[in-house]
Amino acid sequence: MNVVTQLRRRPTAETELPDSLPALLRRLYAQRGVRQMQELERSLRGLLDYRLLGGITQAVEVLRQALADNRRIVIVGDFDADGATSTALTVLALRSMGGREVQYLVPNRFEDGYGLSPEVVAQAAAKGAELIVTVDNGISSHAGVDDAHRRGIAVVVTDHHLPGETLPAAEAMINPNLSDCAFPSKALAGVGVAFYLMMALRANLRECGWFAERGLAEPNLAELLDLVALGTVADVVPLDANNRILISQGLSRIRAGKCRPGIRALLEVSNRDAAQLVASDLGFALGPRLNAAGRLDDMSVGVELLLCNDIVQARMLASDLDALNQSRREIEAGMQVEALHLCEQLERSRDTLPLGLAMYHPQWHQGVVGILASRIKERFHRPVIAFAPAGDGILKGSGRSIAGLHLRDALERLDTCHPGLMLKFGGHAMAAGLSLVEDRFDEFRQRFADLVGEWLDASQLEGVVWSDGELASPELTLGTAEMLREAGPWGQAFPEPTFDGRFRLLQQRLVGERHLKVMVEPLGGGPLLDGIAFNVDTLLWPDSSVREVELAYKLDVNEFRGKRSVQLLIEHLWPL
């Protein structure tokens, strides 16, 4: 099945941005909803005030008292990059503020599942926990919080996931997505919420003379912004103005060589130059290697990497993560072949694919089903949930959606209409996780397909490449590419600029197995440009009969043997 991919241009928008900005940047920012210069602020003074976060006063009080009483604090994280950075940041910050009894615990994806479950509480109790602080989880952990209380353990929940109808009975709860939280940004990642709590705690301790009385140097929390940037980008949260400040500051520290040894080691194994780092490198190079620990092994390896102060140890741990990531890629490649075979079987049985795909194979790896769902969604442009066996007749699924279908809302509707179909579920608009009994998979697959069929129509399943318009030939330069690189950070909901244009196709050849290397020239005349399109359909390309193409592309800086040149990163190409 070939999904039709259309080229559409972002609408132009009014702006109050000053003429001192280059016209191209004014246009690009306006197309992304930026109206005033203050929305482009990158300094820390532009951050939203931590006092606007609901529940932060209570959380600070619980933490301050725990530090004063020298209670044992256990940070309970999550097994993804956001959870790992949140955990490491909170441990480092609390220790720097005088916490002598600060430990951490990351649930094992395969043995414990997600969140603060009673099983995880038992592990925290075994560590002697007197206070549990959740990071990047906890907003739906009713049973875990209740179990902690039965054991005499207090709980502070910090999370950013969407809450359910009822909330756990924690001593304090911070989540910008709570209905009564007035914090203007709802886009903080888990590591962003943790950073805000640590800022508030430091301010409180400063005011009460904590550091002076104990002869402690007041910690510079800006030193942790490399972790904030990595976790925020890797979790693919919207890059609103507040998140762009956090990421810009973190990137600046990394570029200046002021990052933690663990991040430096991740840069080395992924062959990234710290001085030239951009936000997408965090998402596509560092994030996957950190995530590999939680997908295939235990995220404690990732947290230890972020915590360690010794570059030699960091390099060893980063090498382990790099090997895990390579294994993940191999597992994913095999699963993708099987998934495409399942899609072909579905097409043969009913002419067209369902608008919503639920897929299961008994040999799939539950740590990789989320990536698989993402790949299949990209290929067929429809909501996809992939399931893997989790033992004891239970399946765990991970879903990815497209614009127009809020995946968590869809699962909530299924749960309302068919109670008991799912054992549990949670997530966001574009991604969700769930579990169900294996015997009910076929029923779930049909009901999910029916629901998506009601909520979407076929026109919404067409792939769309959004363009910011054409670049004139004089703009197709290294200078423009470098300006765009520095104009970010770009990312989710603040996309890196994509342009379109018609070109004469002068050269085309495959590099690797599926990458198309080209040389093109604008039809109206202009510079000769190198370009590359990754993972092309090799049944279609290269095609020596094609002389002219329409391209959707990003203008990129290519570095080779110390020489910098402009290059087109081709998102899609259409023969003319």
Swiss-Prot record:
Classification via SUPFAM superfamilies: DHH phosphoesterases (SSF64182)
Pfam families referenced in this protein's UniProt entry, alphabetically: DHH (PF01368), DHHA1 (PF02272), RecJ_OB (PF17768)
Source organism per UniProt: Dickeya dadantii (strain 3937) (Erwinia chrysanthemi (strain 3937))
Record's signal peptide: none
Keyword Transmembrane carried by entry: no
Keyword presence, Hydrolase: yes
Tree of life domain: Bacteria
An annotated Gene Ontology molecular function: nucleic acid binding
Keyword line: Exonuclease, Hydrolase, Nuclease
This protein's encoding gene: recJ
UniProt similarity note: Belongs to the RecJ family.
GO biological process: DNA recombination; DNA repair
Protein's recorded name: Single-stranded-DNA-specific exonuclease RecJ
Top-rank EC class of the record's enzyme: hydrolase
Gene3D superfamilies: 3.10.310.30, 3.90.1640.30
Function, as annotated: Single-stranded-DNA-specific exonuclease. Required for many types of recombinational events, although the stringency of the requirement for RecJ appears to vary with the type of recombinational event monitored and the other recombination gene products which are available.
Record-listed E.C. numbers: 3.1.-.-
